[in-house]
């Protein structure tokens, strides 16, 4: 998570929470004049289009006042979806036993991409069973983590 993403998360957690939603996480993708702020929200009863619209209006209002992003961007608000991104240690704990796809910032054993089942989370270390071996990953070295849907 970048410094800007951390700042945005702290700024948006309370307003999104006040609407009754969980701010699962967010990502800011810089692409010149096509930059995108993706905000993922959830609710115990699921997320519907109306929920995303309501959260989008609230987030837009906060962003207009605080103005933390200096470039033009598009705001996308959605549910985490089937390939739910994992941002926090609590997310890994919630999905122990589920398959996850990881992309690392720095390679481990000459690999940046890993896929396996979440075994446990201990502090800032997540243990994933990959091909029968338990591998430990520092959360600080994970650039992207998503659940792998089962069909």
From Swiss-Prot:
GO terms of biological process kind: ribosomal small subunit assembly; translation
Keywords: Cytoplasm, Ribosome biogenesis
Keyword Cytoplasm: yes
GO cellular-component term (any): cytosol
Pfam families, sorted: DUF150_C (PF17384), RimP_N (PF02576)
Chief subcellular location: cytoplasm
Entry-linked InterPro entries: Ribosome_maturation_RimP, RimP_C, RimP_C_sf, RimP_N, RimP_N_sf
Similarity section: Belongs to the RimP family.
Function: Required for maturation of 30S ribosomal subunits.
Protein name per its UniProtKB record: Ribosome maturation factor RimP
Gene this chain is encoded by: rimP
